[in-house]
Regions:
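Conserved G/P- and acidic residue-centered "switch" motifs that form tight phosphate/ATP-binding loops
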Residues: 8, 12, 109, 167
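Bulky hydrophobic/aromatic packing residues
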Residues: 17, 104-105, 192, 210
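Conserved SAM-binding loop
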Residues: 13, 87, 105, 140, ...
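Structural motif
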Residues: 43, 108-110, 165
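N-terminal helical cap/lid subdomain that shapes the substrate entry/recognition surface
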Residues: 2-101, 114, 126
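Hydrophobic residues in well-ordered beta-strands that form the structural core
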Residues: 15, 107-109, 184
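Residue-level detector of anion-binding/catalytic polar loops
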Residues: 34, 104, 181
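Asp-based, Mg2+/Mn2+-dependent phosphohydrolase catalytic module
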Residues: 1-3, 96-99, 112-213
């Protein structure tokens, strides 16, 4: 029986994942590096220590991950301030349905807690969530299972009692490794054959999830 639904945030609840795809390459360009679109997609929801390691593998040990990440955050914040932040289709309807059914909801995101609070508040959906879990709270980010195991612990539930909703491969792997029932709502890319083995379901929008619970 599913007693809670744990959501990824960027690209799942709110339409922000595309900005990571745009602004990782732009931040790298500012420091004299080139990042392909395929590499940018690899970075989605990739937490520490994996993100710094991946970039150093590509660009060398001297690569200043924290400086480039700071630049990416600045560029992304400028774009979000300019364009605004929107919920993904079906988000509010799903959250309202889960609330009526007394199913607990939480967020497990690679984004830091301050920006998580900001984005969810700006989109008007912050009140729906009992817990907000940031990757900064655990030793290893996605695709390690730490963040989902921690989220389940904070909710007082076993992983098998929790459904995880994710849009990216790294997020799916994190939730699957934790033992959650994983539903993917693809944002930037579709799941390949190997990733599909980790999924309970793959649906086009959040609106399709209610009937799975």
């Amino acid at each position: 029986m599913i007693r809670a639904v744990i959501f990824d945030m960027d690209g799942t609840l709110i339409d922000t994942e595309k900005y990571y795809r745009i602004f990782w390459p732009k931040a790298l360009e500012a420091y004299g590096y080139t990042m392909t679109d395929e590499q940018a997609l690899t970075m989605r929801s990739l937490g520490r220590p994996f993100a710094p390691r991946q970039l150093k593998d590509w660009y060398g040990e001297e690569f200043d991950y924290y400086a480039v990440r700071k630049k990416r955050k600045e560029l992304m914040e400028e774009a979000l301030d300019r364009d605004g932040i929107k919920c993904k289709p079906g988000a509010v309807e799903l959250l309202e349905d889960l609330k009526k059914r007394h199913i607990t909801t939480a967020v497990a995101t690679a984004t830091d807690l301050e920006r998580t609070e900001k984005y969810l508040t700006l989109t008007g959906i912050r009140p729906y969530f009992e817990k907000l879990i940031s990757a900064t709270m655990v030793a290893e980010g996605k695709p390690s299972p730490d963040i989902y195991l921690y989220a389940c612990g904070q909710l007082g539930l076993a992983p098998e009692e929790c459904m995880a909703v994710e849009d990216s491969p790294n997020g799916v792997l994190s939730a699957y490794r934790a033992g959650c029932k994983v539903v993917m709502v693809p944002d930037q890319t579709q799941p390949d054959g190997e990733l599909k083995k980790c999924l309970y379901a793959c649906v086009p929008t959040l609106a399709e999830i209610s009937h799975l619970i």
